[in-house]
Amino acid sequence: MSTTKAVIPGSFDPITYGHIDIIDRSADRFDELHICVLKNSGKSGTFSIEERIALIEESVKHLNNVTVHHFNGLLVDFCDKIGAETIIRGLRAVSDFEYELRLTSMNKKLNSNVETMYMMTSTNYSFISSSVVKEVAAYKANVSDFVPVHVEKALNEKFKK
């Protein structure tokens, strides 16, 4: 039987409980889960790629089948490189779907062997985004309900609480 591999891409700037929810649930469904940290050209990052990887690795250390990577290039090329045929994308609300559909259509056009699966974020986390968490943290407010302790500490350091 072949190994099932999936990729969860994202900027993870920083990782939140919403991301971790999708990662945990995906790790139960695939033999190997690869988190691919991508630089979003439309956003300036708060954390470096290396910092994001470290924060993610700490957040998923309880999962033996999860590996964290950085990749410059097309996501479908990363999938080819590691032999993954599934991309997993989390959806918080219907408003996420239009953007995700465009990405899925482009990825399918670039590589017809790669399928995208959507997973709804648990309702507890459906309002959380990295951008909102950073904005709240920048105002020195408590973000412990949205991110793990080590991420909260990193945010506090970035925004010098």
From Swiss-Prot:
Cellular component, GO annotation: cytoplasm
User: Which SUPFAM superfamilies does this one have?
Assistant: Nucleotidylyl transferase
- Give the top-rank taxon of the lineage listed in the UniProt record for this protein: Bacteria
Sequence positions that bind substrate: 11, 43, 75, 89
User: What Enzyme Commission number(s) apply to this enzyme?
Assistant: 2.7.7.3
Q: Could you mention a single GO BP entry for this protein?
A: coenzyme A biosynthetic process
| Pathway terms, separated by semicolons | Cofactor biosynthesis; coenzyme A biosynthesis; CoA from (R)-pantothenate: step 4/5
Q: Which InterPro entries match?
A: Cyt_trans-like, PPAT, Rossmann-like_a/b/a_fold
Q: What is its main location?
A: cytoplasm
Chain sites annotated for binding ATP: 11-12, 19, 90-92, 100, 125-131
Q: A single Gene Ontology molecular function, please?
A: ATP binding
Gene3D superfamilies per record = HUPs
Swiss-Prot/TrEMBL catalytic activity: (R)-4'-phosphopantetheine + ATP + H(+) = 3'-dephospho-CoA + diphosphate
What keywords does the record list, in alphabetical order?
ATP-binding, Coenzyme A biosynthesis, Cytoplasm, Magnesium, Nucleotide-binding, Nucleotidyltransferase, Transferase
Q: Where is this site: Transition state stabilizer?
A: 19
Essential cofactor(s): Mg(2+)
| Compartments it resides in | Cytoplasm
Q: Do the record's keywords include Transit peptide?
A: no
Q: Which NCBIfam families match?
A: coaD_prev_kdtB, cyt_tran_rel
Q: Return the similarity comment.
A: Belongs to the bacterial CoaD family.
Q: What does this protein do?
A: Reversibly transfers an adenylyl group from ATP to 4'-phosphopantetheine, yielding dephospho-CoA (dPCoA) and pyrophosphate.
Fill in the subunit field for this protein. Homohexamer.
State the protein's name: Phosphopantetheine adenylyltransferase
The organism named in the record is: Staphylococcus saprophyticus subsp. saprophyticus (strain ATCC 15305 / DSM 20229 / NCIMB 8711 / NCTC 7292 / S-41)
